[in-house]
């Protein structure tokens, strides 16, 4: 028997696939199309087995769909711009491009060793000029259509990364990438107007029936739609009005103060002259606070009285105006009406600063005394102390008050979103340059499309100054105005790398097209992506941005679809020693080492077998050992059978006895189950269990039946179907088996094994015999036996006679196909 040498076998078949261009996808085919895509990696170094899980899941889907007769597009690439490359340049003196290309080569080699069925002719890297030229083109389309604009804004600043961050890149007040506390800076920045699409991005989530509900919920929460009213509060002794947005206009009569965000321009405008110095001290102190933490209910509330008053438009009362640390500029209007009786944060603030508390909603079953309240009452109830609305249930009051405000001209109905416009400027080098020119005469001028790409210069100083390295490169910065030909300057910020990844799935369709980003006919044939696979950590950022860019390109007439991903699968993580794998923790498992020790097929099967693919799982060395033992047992079983079946075929297969019938029934029921496991929600772990079960049944047959009585045609059918069903999971092993079965073709080009419904029919069934509640015997009978015939057989059995022993039978109950219950 030949020995299992996985490294030799895997290298051989990978070379055959490459040489025959097996996975190179034609642009058109008679077959139905299927686009399987895994989120592309950031090339930061080497892959660990956690990354590999993603690619293996994608490969099972792609290989299975090929065998099901689809024209499958399954490409790979690299999200290759980004901060770590630039940090490496600063720390190690390596150019970001050199560092990135080196990592890309490493990852490509690692992925190829896994035997993933990618069409390598479509490989892309977002840092290639032929790619980022079209990222810049997309920017220009948004700019020309009023969806890209520049404004001075209070932005999140990471002091360590020395760049701005989008709101989505800040987690609990810290930089998502490095964990440093984020500060606020006021800078001129470029934005994409994603808020124009807020309602569609929200509503169209209902169309995405192939997405996990929790991902859609995360997007809904991020978009954060609120319906309420906008109300203007006049400032006493001034023409200024403070506009607030509230979802609780029913509490207007309980407003006892106004609070502005520290970042609000109204703060400087309204403060009394004699308070300016103290105000600056307060603002400086608040700026040091974690701006996300300071808004929480538990955080210490701090305020500063500006010395000015507003007028409550519904009561005419004077109410003090404060600056408060718990108000953020980006939510609502950056100002709130303080209703301490009915909002916990307002309550804490009012208690601290001695502001009156006025109850305007009371529970149905009791009164509230503001003097005795220990917390705000935030529930529904009856409106009180509310002028014309006294006695109105608050649930009805919201709508009634909005209508009344509109009639009186005091306020208006309003819908607000938590979503803010997408900040895309980055003060870094390693990104796609923003294609804008500044001319003193002509103003802001977009780079003409024929002049794209705006190329990144190579000779740049990577000083972490907080300004883009491009701003110090005179050769890049100085240019001519495309309109007047005069001296001009280029924009020196680069784009957020999420812009690069917001459209990459479109570029795979025509990755090397020079005159456009994609061919409309091709992109409309292949897209939307049929199955997208990636981590849930991208639920908001990448997926929301990709949906936005797709909708924009659809509206501009470039695409005939407006959602990029029909089905989304979010895989679980692989942990080691109870923690997420990372170099700093020293718990990384290298796929290269596992392939060297066990082979890629073992690694692939173990990753899929360890848990359902959507669940997190703990890496176990004993677990991969166990899968490797199974593969060796499978190898030995196959090569035990091979000499008996190599020249055999499955035509005119005759089953000679019940053992053979049962073995064939098990074969076909397992093929049916594996098919259903793959089709019905990626139950790859149970599909692999099915393969293991089939090998067990085959081994039992070989061990219990003399060789000369083996049914060779049946064995041929079993090893053929087993090889075909194995091929998505352990493709190299399956190719070796298929070849050794005497086939000239490749297993990867075969159809998925079918099952015979007739073979699933059971002719005989084992019935348990229970006497007075205890199983005393079992009997095998024809599946369609009548109760009368069964009763005769059962009562004639020696074991039954022993227990009945001439006693009268009170009951004889038969549960068809399962059990007989005799009561004596």
UniProtKB/Swiss-Prot annotation:
The protein's name: Leucine--tRNA ligase
Motif 'KMSKS' region boundaries: 580-584
Positions in coiled-coil regions: none
Reactions that this protein is recorded to catalyse: tRNA(Leu) + L-leucine + ATP = L-leucyl-tRNA(Leu) + AMP + diphosphate
Gene3D superfamilies from the UniProt entry: 3.10.20.590, HUPs, Isoleucyl-tRNA Synthetase, Domain 1
Species lineage: Bacteria, Thermotogati, Thermotogota, Thermotogae, Thermotogales
Record gene name: leuS
Family: Belongs to the class-I aminoacyl-tRNA synthetase family.
Compartment annotation: Cytoplasm
GO cellular component: cytosol
GO molecular function: aminoacyl-tRNA deacylase activity; ATP binding; leucine-tRNA ligase activity
Motif 'HIGH' region in this chain: 41-51
PANTHER family: LEUCINE--TRNA LIGASE, MITOCHONDRIAL, LEUCYL-TRNA SYNTHETASE
Top-level EC class: ligase
Keyword annotations: Aminoacyl-tRNA synthetase, ATP-binding, Cytoplasm, Ligase, Nucleotide-binding, Protein biosynthesis
CDD domains xrefs: Anticodon_Ia_Leu_BEm (cd07958), LeuRS_core (cd00812)
E.C. numbers: 6.1.1.4
């Amino acid at each position: 028997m030949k020995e299992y040498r996985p490294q030799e076998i895997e290298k051989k078949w990978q070379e055959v696939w490459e040489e025959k261009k097996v996975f190179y996808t034609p642009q058109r085919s008679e077959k139905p199309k299927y686009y399987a895509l895994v989120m592309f990696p950031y090339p930061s170094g080497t892959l660990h087995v956690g990354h590999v899980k993603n690619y293996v899941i994608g490969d099972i889907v792609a290989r299975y769909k090929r065998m099901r007769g689809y024209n499958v597009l399954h490409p790979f690439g690299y999200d290759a711009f980004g901060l770590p490359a630039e940090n490496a340049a600063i720390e190690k003196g390596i150019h970001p491009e050199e560092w990135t290309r080196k990592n890309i080569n490493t990852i490509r080699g690692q992925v190829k060793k896994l035997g993933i069925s990618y069409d390598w002719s479509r490989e892309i890297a977002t840092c290639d000029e032929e790619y980022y030229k079209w990222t810049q083109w997309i920017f220009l389309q948004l700019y020309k259509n009023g969806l890209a604009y520049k404004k001075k804004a209070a932005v999140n600043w990471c002091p360590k990364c020395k760049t701005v961050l989008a709101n989505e890149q800040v987690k609990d007040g810290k930089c998502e990438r490095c964990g440093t506390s984020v500060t606020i800076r006021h800078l001129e920045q470029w934005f994409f107007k994603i808020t124009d699409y807020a309602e569609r991005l929200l509503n169209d989530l209902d169309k995405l029936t192939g997405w996990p509900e929790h991902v859609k919920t995360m997007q809904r929460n991020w978009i954060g739609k609120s319906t309420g009213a906008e109300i203007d509060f006049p400032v006493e002794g001034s023409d200024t009005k403070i506009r607030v947005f509230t979802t609780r206009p029913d509490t207007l009569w309980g407003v006892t103060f106004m609070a502005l965000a520290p970042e609000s321009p109204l703060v400087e405008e309204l403060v009394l002259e004699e308070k300016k110095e103290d105000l600056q001290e307060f603002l400086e102190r608040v700026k040091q606070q974690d701006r996300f933490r300071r808004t929480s209910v538990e955080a210490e509330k701090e305020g500063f009285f500006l010395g000015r008053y507003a007028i409550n438009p519904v009561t005419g009362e004077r109410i003090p105006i404060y600056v408060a640390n718990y108000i953020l500029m980006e939510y609502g209007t950056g100002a709130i009406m303080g209703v301490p009786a009915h909002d916990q944060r307002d309550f804490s603030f009012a208690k601290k600063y001695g502001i009156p508390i006025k109850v305007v909603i009371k529970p149905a079953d009791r009164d509230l005394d503001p003097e005795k309240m220990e917390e705000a009452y935030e529930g529904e109830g009856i409106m009180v102390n509310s002028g014309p609305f006294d006695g109105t249930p608050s649930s009805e009051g919201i709508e009634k008050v909005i209508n009344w405000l509109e009639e009186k001209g005091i306020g208006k109905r309003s819908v607000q979103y938590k979503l803010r416009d997408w900040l895309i400027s980055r003060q870094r080098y390693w990104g796609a340059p923003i294609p804008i020119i500044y001319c003193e005469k002509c103003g802001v001028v977009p780079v003409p499309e024929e002049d794209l790409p705006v190329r990144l210069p190579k000779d740049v100083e990577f000083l972490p100054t907080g300004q883009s390295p491009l701003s110090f490169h005179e050769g890049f910065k100085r240019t001519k105005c495309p309109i007047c030909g005069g001296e001009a300057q280029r924009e020196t910020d680069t784009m957020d790398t999420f812009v690069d990844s917001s459209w990459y799935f479109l570029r795979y369709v025509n990755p090397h097209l020079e005159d456009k980003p994609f061919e409309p006919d091709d992109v409309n044939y292949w897209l939307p992506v049929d199955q997208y696979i990636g981590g849930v950590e991208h639920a908001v950022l990448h997926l929301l941005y990709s949906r936005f860019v797709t909708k924009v390109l659809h509206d501009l007439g470039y695409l005939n679809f407006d959602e990029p991903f029909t089905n989304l699968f979010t895989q679980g993580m692989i942990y080691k020693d109870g923690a997420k794998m990372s170099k700093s923790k020293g718990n990384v498992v290298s796929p290269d080492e596992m392939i060297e020790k066990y082979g890629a097929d073992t690694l692939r099967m173990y990753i899929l077998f360890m848990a359902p693919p959507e669940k997190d799982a703990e890496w176990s060395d004993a677990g991969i050992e166990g899968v490797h033992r199974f593969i060796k047992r499978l190898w030995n079983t196959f090569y035990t059978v091979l000499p008996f079946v190599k020249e055999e075929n499955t035509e005119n297969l005759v089953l000679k006895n019940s053992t053979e019938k049962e073995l064939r029934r098990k074969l076909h029921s397992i093929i049916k189950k594996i098919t259903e496991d793959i089709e019905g929600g990626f139950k790859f772990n149970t599909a692999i269990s099915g393969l293991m079960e089939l090998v067990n049944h085959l081994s039992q047959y070989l061990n219990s039946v003399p060789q000369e009585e083996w049914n060779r045609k049946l064995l041929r059918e079993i090893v053929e179907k087993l090889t075909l069903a194995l091929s998505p999971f352990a493709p190299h092993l399956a190719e070796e088996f298929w070849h050794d079965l005497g086939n000239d073709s490749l297993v990867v080009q075969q159809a998925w094994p079918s099952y015979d419904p007739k073979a699933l029919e059971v002719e005989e069934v084992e019935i348990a015999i229970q006497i007075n509640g205890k199983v005393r015997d079992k009997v095998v009978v024809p599946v369609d036996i009548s109760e009368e015939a069964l009763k005769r057989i059962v009562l004639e059995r020696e074991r039954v006679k022993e227990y009945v022993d001439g006693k009268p039978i009170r009951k004889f109950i038969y549960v068809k196909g399962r059990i007989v219950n005799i009561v004596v």
